[in-house]
Amino acid sequence: MKKLESSLTNMVLVLTGVAVVMGGILAYVNHLTEGPIAEQKTKALADGIKTVMCVSDLKVSRTDTVHQNDAKGKELTYIIYQTQDAQGQDLGAAVESVTGGFGGDLKVLVGFDAEGKILGYTLLEHAETPGLGAKADKWFQKGEKGDIIGKTPSDPLTVSKDGGQVDAITASTITSRAFLLAVNNAYNAFKATPTADAETGATKQMKK
């Protein structure tokens, strides 16, 4: 009996030791990868802003954060990157907007000119189904079936199935609705952005 108790104690100690060592290794690996992952996200955002504003040489002149409630009363946060060209002329803004897609959160970056017209968009993060909802990165671009470029969402953009004029992604109506909601919300946040001249966020140059 004592031998059995001793064996169990040793087993517990060994398993505990292994768990501690593995936990330390995972923590170390996470520490090593945090920096590169953060740098990758920063670069993706910088490239995304250039893409959606359709300008390769620009700077973010001001960063604003807008909080608005959705239809269910949930508070949503939007980040607005006010942009200028190399000569200091205002171009409009790129807006980060997140909604729930079919497979998880759908984070969209939408570029607007000063009047609120859509210049471009890109997906920063998504968990949509490859070959279906994931097509959102191309489907709504200029010249594509669901083209929204050049539109102003003062009247919310909706899919044709809901009485709107935007063709939904084939077999991916949920993703299409989520995407358009993200764009509509981004527009509303853009229009609600403070117009003060004072900078409220970091200013940085973005060159090709």
Predicted segments with their positions:
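Flexible, solvent-exposed loop/hinge segments and secondary-structure transition points
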Residues: 2-208
